[in-house]
Curated annotation (Swiss-Prot):
<keyword id="KW-0067">ATP-binding</keyword>
<dbReference type="GO" id="GO:0005524">
    <property type="term" value="F:ATP binding"/>
</dbReference>
<dbReference type="InterPro" id="IPR018022">
    <property type="entry name" value="IPT"/>
</dbReference>
<protein>
    <recommendedName>
        <fullName>tRNA dimethylallyltransferase</fullName>
        <ecNumber>2.5.1.75</ecNumber>
    </recommendedName>
</protein>
<dbReference type="Pfam" id="PF01715">
    <property type="entry name" value="IPPT"/>
</dbReference>
<keyword id="KW-0808">Transferase</keyword>
<keyword id="KW-0819">tRNA processing</keyword>
<feature type="region of interest" description="Interaction with substrate tRNA">
    <location>
        <begin position="35"/>
        <end position="38"/>
    </location>
</feature>
<keyword id="KW-0547">Nucleotide-binding</keyword>
<comment type="function">
    <text>Catalyzes the transfer of a dimethylallyl group onto the adenine at position 37 in tRNAs that read codons beginning with uridine, leading to the formation of N6-(dimethylallyl)adenosine (i(6)A).</text>
</comment>
<dbReference type="GO" id="GO:0052381">
    <property type="term" value="F:tRNA dimethylallyltransferase activity"/>
</dbReference>
<feature type="site" description="Interaction with substrate tRNA">
    <location>
        <position position="127"/>
    </location>
</feature>
<comment type="similarity">
    <text>Belongs to the IPP transferase family.</text>
</comment>
<feature type="site" description="Interaction with substrate tRNA">
    <location>
        <position position="101"/>
    </location>
</feature>
<keyword id="KW-0460">Magnesium</keyword>
<dbReference type="InterPro" id="IPR027417">
    <property type="entry name" value="P-loop_NTPase"/>
</dbReference>
<dbReference type="GO" id="GO:0006400">
    <property type="term" value="P:tRNA modification"/>
</dbReference>
Amino acid sequence: MKTKIIVIVGPTAVGKTALAIEVAKRFNGEVVSGDSQQVYRGLDIGTAKASPEEQAAVPHHLIDVREITESYSAFDFVSEAKMTIEDIHSRGKLAIIAGGTGLYIQSLLEGYHLGGETPHEEILAYRASLEPYSDEELAHLVEQAGLEIPQFNRRRAMRALEIAHFGQDLENQEILYEPLIICLDDERSQLYERINHRVDLMFEAGLLDEAKWLFDHSPNVQAAKGIGYKELFPYFRGEQTFEEARESLKQATRRFAKRQLTWFRNRMQVTFYQIGESGVQDRILSQIEEFLDD
């Protein structure tokens, strides 16, 4: 029997953390961060980590598990998330994955093999090469490869082609979880307002000092490449004014949110909820209750 988990995804600033905490309180759960930047110690404001008070109210995992000089990959996330979910489940609690790093979460849910003899970078590159193909073209590739897919869908076809390409045994790519995937969204102009407001609040909370610390200590590490930091580096180098850098950060974050939504819409089987609609949280909680009781 697969382990039931709740997955909360969506663009930045849409309210994933707040909902995850509410779900955890309601259903005796713990939150597992699905964010590639929140793993780094010292990067708190720019990554929008749950506050110390929020983390005290509900256990959070995969936050502050790396130094800024260390790398972190989808393979690392999948390995550590699996162990964390198993621990949470063994204690009779519900695991709630919440975050916006679509690649990490998709890799966890769909049982992608990111280790072994084939470097995971090669697997991810091959997967990306299949994205431009239409469903009809993918079906043709599946037929050419001599593969059989009982009920064709895009994700299943891509996964079968990936496994055939790398010579991996399909039966070894075990899908461990039965997820309910909730994707939060908002009307575009409202979402962009939320993003702009969040960036302003981050600066009020000390983002500039946090980014300057990263710039002074480790400007070329993986952690520094995340949105929220690298956009401010031109200001520190004297190449932009502060206002230009702040607007650059807002623009980059808006574009990132658009890419996130595209990923969740096209690559994952999600249930969308518009956060601006009346009673949306109650409807989400009701769906979760039905899912867990089924």
